[in-house]
Amino acid sequence: MIIYLHGFDSNSPGNHEKVLQLQFIDPDVRFVNYSTLHPKHDMQHLIKEVHKLIEESDDTKPLICGVGLGGYWAERIGFLCGIKQVIFNPNLNPSVNMEGRIDRPEEYIDIGTKCVADFREKNAGNCLCVLSTNDEVLDNQLTSDALSDFYKIIWDETQNHKFKKISQHLQAMKAFKE
């Protein structure tokens, strides 16, 4: 089972396309929707939904995947639920770069203080990070600097922030999932 978390643009047709692409490596892909506007509520909702999906699944090696803001959540929720994560262009600092787009960006700071201390050290090796060199939203060199001590980084030379096409990374994801 692969659990897919969308980014800030939850209505993007690219989300459906990514789900279809993910089905090439696992026919059981679950799309979990969340508001994107209320971080504390989103975190509670995502933990509950992901935990429920894991409990209902026979897959002994489920994977959670997200793009942008979905990558932020996939890393954390996957860690908290004990499953591997694949994150594409994760938004590591939504409290800074989501200001003006969501109601309470400061809640991300609060969430960060409530998570397990040094969670990336404890999560080392359980997350695969794919970063675009053409990300028009985030500086992915900063993202790489923050994550490369803990996770394998794959650089993509063609996609932009929304990562419409993930197919070139499916085999790496499949190998990582196993």
UniProtKB/Swiss-Prot annotation:
Domain of life: Bacteria
InterPro entries to which the protein is assigned, alphabetical: AB_hydrolase_fold (IPR029058), UPF0227 (IPR022987), UPF0227/Esterase_YqiA (IPR008886)
Disulfide topology: none
Family: Belongs to the UPF0227 family.
NCBIfam families found in the cross-reference section: PRK04940.1
Protein name as it appears in the record: UPF0227 protein PBPRA2397
